[in-house]
């Protein structure tokens, strides 16, 4: 019996994806829509290293990320480093390092590659890309207004109809006042209760109640007040004793102006919005998919006024959000918003005969110089086989350049979808393809 060789697996690392050309077409389209939308608001793109000091995340990221999700190791220089799980700490470091030279307000965005060691599931992978949009240097609610407009505009740019998503808004000071003033909790209790509130939607009501008991002194009364808070609206929440009414007024004013700008139908006050990151200090929000098969948070963000405090004595207000590519793709698929991304906009040019290789390549060069995407075969296989390749690759239009076409200064174009084929004059060919075939 012959020895069997143990081949390496062709599967990617758990929680990651291979991006074949068809996958890259989708990813590039998603990124281009996001990028174009944010650029239209005057934002500038930035990037940073995928490796950072472990201390940066220890200081700025949430407890769950640092203790359970961080990919970290000791490098060859005996430094403890980590692969970035989020972009905000890097952003804070970069802004603080060049603070005096940056004109305010600072409007930046990025689409970085991020890593977290967590159990893969729907909408969650260990490696993903995330649009990060951040605005620094504006203290007023107009910063929240602009960020929420961008968050809304992105989904509209993808063609999302009204009702397909909902923007839920709350305020961190509202929650803090409820926990400290209304429930009269101490520091450890505040920490425990807020963590439970953040994961409430992921556990059963029974588990939520059971896990809440150790943090409450007068369970029945305090738990009843928690339920009242979670079920309140902008009118009723302000009636809870000890609540921060300034936060309520802030959200009311914000909603009024956003309504005047046409996005009131998507807005909802929801005090259960917590946002797990420890650095949020003000208004917070999450965008939710309303599809019954994918009722989950798509993305979110909020204000973080103390973000650069570890790097500088200067204060700089900031607000931003992050939108991951995995949850966005699920949303687009669930609402049938992904367009036809096949190679219909690219010409396929077979070689009719070996003697016509140079003429064929001259034609492809001419088309590309006129900004028409063109793939040219590199050998003169049987024409039927070349057509099969074009069909398999998803092309729609094939150009034929044979000896008779060269003599008559024409080309033949065939639509592989309809089967129609006709002759086109070689003169002005690029203009004809753009005008009549939308290439």
UniProtKB/Swiss-Prot annotation:
EC number, as in UniProt: 6.1.1.21
Keywords from UniProt, A to Z, are: Aminoacyl-tRNA synthetase, ATP-binding, Cytoplasm, Ligase, Nucleotide-binding, Protein biosynthesis
Q: Name one GO cellular component term.
A: cytoplasm
What catalytic activity does the UniProt entry give for this protein? tRNA(His) + L-histidine + ATP = L-histidyl-tRNA(His) + AMP + diphosphate + H(+)
A biological process term (GO) from this entry: histidyl-tRNA aminoacylation
Record-given protein name: Histidine--tRNA ligase
Family of the protein in this entry:
Belongs to the class-II aminoacyl-tRNA synthetase family.
Keyword Ligase on entry: yes
NCBIfam families in alphabetical order: hisS
Give this protein's Gene Ontology molecular function annotations. Answer: ATP binding; histidine-tRNA ligase activity
Pfam families the record matches = HGTP_anticodon, tRNA-synt_His
Q: How does it assemble?
A: Homodimer.
HAMAP family of this UniProt entry? His_tRNA_synth (MF_00127)
Coiled-coil positions? none
Q: Which InterPro entries match?
A: aa-tRNA-synth_II (IPR006195), aa-tRNA-synth_II/BPL/LPL (IPR045864), Anticodon-bd (IPR004154), Anticodon-bd_dom_sf (IPR036621), His-tRNA-ligase (IPR015807), HisRS-like_core (IPR041715), HisRS/HisZ (IPR004516), HisRS_anticodon (IPR033656)
Intracellular or extracellular location(s)? Cytoplasm
Q: Does the keyword Membrane apply?
A: no
Which leading EC class covers this enzyme? Answer: ligase
Taxonomic superkingdom? Bacteria
Chief location of this protein?
Answer: cytoplasm
């Amino acid at each position: 019996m012959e020895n069997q060789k143990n081949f390496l697996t062709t599967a990617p690392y758990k929680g990651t994806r291979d991006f074949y050309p068809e996958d890259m077409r989708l990813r590039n389209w998603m990124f281009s829509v996001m990028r174009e939308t944010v650029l239209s608001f005057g934002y500038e793109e930035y990037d940073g290293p995928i490796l950072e000091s472990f201390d940066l995340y220890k200081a700025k990221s949430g407890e769950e990320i640092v203790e359970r999700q961080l990919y970290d190791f000791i490098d060859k220089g005996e430094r403890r480093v980590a692969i970035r799980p989020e972009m905000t700490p890097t952003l804070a470091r970069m802004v603080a390092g060049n603070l005096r030279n940056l004109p305010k307000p600072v409007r930046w965005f990025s689409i970085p590659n991020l890593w977290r060691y967590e159990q893969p599931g729907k909408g969650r992978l260990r490696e993903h890309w995330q649009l990060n949009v951040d605005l620094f240097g504006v203290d007023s609610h107009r910063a929240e207004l602009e960020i929420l407009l961008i968050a809304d505009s992105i989904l509209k740019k993808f063609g999302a109809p009204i009702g397909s998503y909902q923007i839920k808004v709350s305020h961190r000071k509202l929650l803090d006042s409820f926990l400290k003033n209304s429930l009269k909790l101490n520091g450890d209790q505040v920490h425990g209760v807020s963590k439970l509130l953040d994961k409430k939607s992921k556990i059963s009501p029974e588990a939520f109640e059971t896990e809440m008991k150790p943090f409450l002194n007068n369970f029945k009364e305090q738990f009843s007040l928690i339920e009242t808070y979670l079920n309140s609206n902008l009118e009723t929440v302000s009636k809870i004793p000890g609540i921060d009414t300034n936060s309520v007024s802030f959200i009311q004013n914000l909603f009024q102006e956003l309504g005047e700008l046409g996005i009131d139908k998507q807005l909802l006050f929801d005090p259960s919005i917590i946002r797990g990151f420890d650095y949020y200090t003000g208004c917070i929000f999450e965008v939710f998919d309303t599809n019954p098969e994918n009722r989950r948070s798509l993305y979110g963000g909020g204000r973080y006024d103390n973000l650069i405090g570890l790097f500088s004595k200067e204060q700089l207000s900031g607000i931003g959000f992050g939108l991951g590519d995995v949850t966005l793709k699920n949303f687009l698929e669930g609402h049938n918003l992904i367009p036809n991304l096949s190679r219909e906009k690219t010409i396929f040019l077979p070689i009719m005969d070996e003697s016509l290789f140079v003429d064929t390549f001259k034609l492809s060069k001419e088309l590309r110089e006129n900004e028409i995407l063109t793939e040219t075969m590199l050998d003169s296989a049987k024409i039927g086989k070349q057509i099969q390749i074009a069909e398999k690759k998803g092309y729609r239009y094939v150009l034929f350049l044979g000896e008779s076409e060269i003599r008559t200064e024409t080309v033949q174009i065939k639509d592989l979808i309809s089967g129609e084929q006709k002759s086109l004059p070689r003169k002005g060919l690029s203009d004809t393809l753009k005008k009549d075939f939308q290439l």
